[in-house]
Structure formats: structure tokens, C-alpha cells
């Protein structure tokens, strides 16, 4: 018995000797505890014994948590960091703590948080992040926290929540999320429905209120009236040349993205050409086709002209403009996308066959396209191909500018029969 006591004393002395200044280390109820609270620390100390299971750094002056801050203590089960001055938690600061069960980051100034670190904390049961400056939580932030029972997010600056944020938390029994400045728009409607039907305890619901829009300020979320909301939908139409039409230099291709949704979706164009990828947040030009103030362009008329009504014009369409044109619409409820492949071919040179081979991204699945009466007939929903034929009979001619009165075809651009260059612009 005396030998056992001596062994325990040696272990405790060794633990105490390994404890960094000015912390105190010891064992209590089978837990190896390192107490560094109220020490005016401005950085996480180093030199902890590897078997520490509880670490308290509360009530210090820590400004941030750098990557690898707790690499020395991989067996931590409880980490207390409340009442510091932490503004940022870097990627890798917490990722090594796979055995962590309790994490308290409350009463700090955190606005920059490495949410991906939570993916490694599958044993976590308590997460306190209340009283910080958080403005956003990624949809997949809690995807690995299936053991989490209590989550505190109250008194932050959260304006909205992505639908499904709490779905992975199958063990959750307590959620505190009051006193956040929620925008009571379509993006928050799902949370109202979830909060009214879930078995999770959500205290202080009288303080889960709207901050905006102004007419709803102060309204309790659980009393919010139904809102007219719908996810985006898109329909992409185009006005290419008729098969065999004679094209002159300066040909303009017109695409139109018809967008629907509530709230009104934001339109974005994604263009993949042989020269690279082009991203355009619509619009980038005014009604006259000239670049809007603040838009970076090589000239006053951008190569790709995105108008506010959903039309996209490509002046001087040529081989460099071949590729895939996609319009994407996004609002608070989701996104939708539609694409079309556009290519040039020269009659008599096997152009159609070559283009067919070029855009067989789904050929292995039996999804190909063919043209009938100048309309694309896709046999698969993803693959639309517009084939534009160039004439070899004429020499180069000067391209006309794209200006003109809507409803009248600018001269010298394209022989389209009854088709009008500004068909799309004039229709809206």
C-alpha cells in the first residue's frame, strides 16, 4: 500500500513539474486538469503534459487561436475559453481534439471561425458559442456533430440560417439562438417551421425576433405570417443563325435567360471558352450596350454583354467565343442553372460531325443531340448544342456596331431572314 501511495505521489509530482507557468495542474475525480484561468494570458501556453483531459483558459486576454494551438493535448475532453478577447479561430486550432466533449468559446469577439475544424470533433456534446460576433454559419458546419446535445448561439449577429443547418444534430436536445438580428425574409421561413415542430428545447423564443425588413422589426419569429416564397427557375433561349445562313463578320449571338423566383433571383453567367472561364454578374452593361461604371472591360463595349433583363449578347461571335454558356439564378431558397453549347461550323468540311464529337460529354451515357429545322432536340436533359454555320463564299467585311433601335435590325451584322438582332432586348 505504501508503494502504491509513493507511485501516485511520483505521478502527481511529475504532472505538476510538467505544468507550464503560471498554470496549475493536478488530478481530480480521475481527470487530469490544467487550470490557466484568470492569469492575464495573451497566448496559449506550451509545455502541457499530453494526458491533460481538462484545460481552462477562461478569463484571460487571448486575442486569437492559431493553428495547432492544442496539438500538445490530444486527449482533451473539456476546453474552456470563455471571457477572452478572441476574434479569430484559425483552421487547425481545434481539429486535433477528436476526443473533445465540451467546448466553451462564449463571451468573446469571434467573427472569423474555422467551421471546418468542427468536422473532426465527432465526440462533442456541448458547444457554447454565444455572445460573439458571428454573422454566418455554413450549411455543413455541424455535419459531424451527431453526439451534440446542447448548442448555444444566442447573442450573436446572425441574420439568416441555411436550410438544414441543424439536420445532422440527431442527438440535439437544447438550442439557444435568441437575440440575433434575423432578416425575416424567405431564407428564414424554414427555421420558423422547424422551430415550431421540433422536439428540441428552444428557450426564450420571445426574444427570437425580426430586425429587418423595417415593417417586421420586433416581430417574434414564431408569429411571422406566411411569405410568398419560391426557389429559382430558369429557361435559356437563344437566337442563332438559321441552318445555312450566310454570316458576315460582326455576327451577334443573342441568348436570353428567363428567370423566375421569389425573392427575385440574382442572375449570373458562367462562360467556358477555349481561352478560359468568364464569370459575369448580370448586368455589366446598360441598355445602350456600354459598360456600366465600375465594370472592368477592355473597351466601352464588353466582349460579353449582359443586360438587366436577362439577355446576353456576344458581338463579333467567332471561334474564340465557342463553348458552353450557362445562366445561373440564385436566391435565398436555392439556385437553378441552364446551359447551352455553342459552336461554329463551315459547310462542306464535316463541321457538324466534328462538333458532334466535340460536345459528346455524355456520349457514354447515350445522351447526344441532333438538329431538326434549326431547333436543338436533345435526347438528354444536359446536352444542348447550337451549331452555327459560316459561309466561305464571301471575304471579310467591316463589322457594324451593335447600336440600333429595338425592333430594327442593325445593318451588316447577320442575315437572319425574319430574325431580329435585338429580339430579346425589344421583348422586355
UniProtKB/Swiss-Prot annotation:
Tell me the disulfide pairings in this chain: 257-327
Protein name, UniProt field = Immunoglobulin superfamily containing leucine-rich repeat protein
* Sorted UniProt keywords: Disulfide bond, Glycoprotein, Immunoglobulin domain, Leucine-rich repeat, Repeat, Secreted, Signal
The places in or outside the cell where this protein is found are: Secreted
InterPro entries associated with the record = Cys-rich_flank_reg_C, Ig-like_dom, Ig-like_dom_sf, Ig-like_fold, Ig_I-set, Ig_sub2, Leu-rich_rpt, Leu-rich_rpt_typical-subtyp
PANTHER family, per database record: KEKKON 5, ISOFORM A, SYNAPTIC ADHESION-LIKE MOLECULE SALM
Occurrences of domain LRRCT (ranges): 180-231
Q: Which domain of life is it from?
A: Eukaryota
Annotated Ig-like domain residues: 232-343
- Per the UniProt entry, the glycosylated residues are 51, 309
LRR repeat copies, ranges: 51-72, 75-96, 99-122, 123-144, 147-168
Q: Which residues form the LRRNT domain?
A: 19-50
Amino acid at each position: 500500500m505504501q508503494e502504491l501511495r509513493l507511485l501516485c505521489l511520483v505521478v502527481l509530482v511529475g504532472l505538476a513539474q510538467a505544468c507550464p507557468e503560471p498554470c496549475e495542474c493536478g488530478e481530480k475525480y480521475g481527470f487530469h486538469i490544467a487550470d490557466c484561468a484568470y492569469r492575464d494570458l495573451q497566448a496559449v501556453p506550451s509545455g502541457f503534459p499530453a494526458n491533460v483531459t481538462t484545460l481552462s483558459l477562461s478569463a484571460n486576454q487571448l486575442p486569437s487561436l492559431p493553428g495547432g494551438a492544442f496539438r500538445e493535448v490530444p486527449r482533451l475532453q473539456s476546453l474552456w475559453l470563455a471571457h477572452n478577447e478572441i476574434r479569430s479561430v484559425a483552421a487547425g486550432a481545434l481539429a486535433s481534439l477528436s476526443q473533445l466533449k465540451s467546448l466553451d468559446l462564449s463571451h468573446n469577439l469571434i467573427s472569423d471561425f474555422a467551421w471546418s475544424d468542427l468536422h473532426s470533433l465527432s465526440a462533442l456534446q456541448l458547444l457554447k458559442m454565444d455572445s460573439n460576433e458571428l454573422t454566418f454559419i455554413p450549411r455543413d458546419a455541424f455535419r459531424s456533430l451527431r453526439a451534440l446535445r446542447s448548442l448555444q448561439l444566442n447573442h450573436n449577429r446572425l441574420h439568416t440560417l441555411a436550410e438544414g443547418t441543424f439536420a445532422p444534430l440527431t442527438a440535439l436536445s437544447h438550442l439557444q439562438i435568441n437575440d440575433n438580428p434575423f432578416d425575416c425574409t424567405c431564407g428564414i421561413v424554414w427555421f420558423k417551421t422547424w422551430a415550431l415542430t421540433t422536439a428540441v428545447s428552444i428557450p426564450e423564443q420571445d426574444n427570437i425576433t425580426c430586425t429587418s425588413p423595417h415593417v417586421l422589426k420586433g416581430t417574434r419569429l414564431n408569429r411571422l405570417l406566411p411569405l410568398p416564397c419560391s426557389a429559382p427557375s430558369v429557361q435559356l433561349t437563344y437566337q442563332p443563325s438559321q441552318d445555312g445562313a450566310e454570316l458576315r463578320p460582326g455576327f451577334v449571338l443573342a441568348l436570353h435567360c428567363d428567370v423566375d423566383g421569389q425573392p427575385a433571383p440574382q442572375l449570373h453567367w458562367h462562360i467556358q471558352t477555349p481561352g478560359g472561364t468568364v464569370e459575369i454578374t448580370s448586368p455589366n452593361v446598360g441598355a445602350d450596350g456600354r459598360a456600366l461604371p465600375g465594370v472592368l472591360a477592355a473597351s466601352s463595349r464588353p466582349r460579353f454583354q449582359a443586360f438587366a433583363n436577362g439577355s446576353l449578347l456576344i458581338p463579333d461571335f467567332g471561334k474564340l467565343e465557342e463553348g458552353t454558356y450557362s445562366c445561373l439564378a440564385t436566391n435565398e431558397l436555392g439556385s437553378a442553372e441552364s446551359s447551352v453549347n455553342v459552336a461554329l461550323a463551315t459547310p462542306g468540311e464535316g463541321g457538324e460531325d466534328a462538333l458532334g464529337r466535340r460536345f459528346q460529354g455524355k456520349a457514354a451515357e447515350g445522351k447526344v443531340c441532333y438538329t431538326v429545322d434549326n431547333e436543338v432536340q436533345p435526347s438528354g436533359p444536359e446536352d444542348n448544342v447550337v451549331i452555327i454555320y459560316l459561309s466561305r463564299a464571301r471575304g471579310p467585311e467591316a463589322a457594324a456596331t451593335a447600336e440600333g433601335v429595338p425592333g430594327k435590325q442593325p445593318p451588316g451584322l447577320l442575315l437572319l431572314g425574319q430574325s431580329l438582332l435585338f429580339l430579346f432586348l425589344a421583348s422586355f
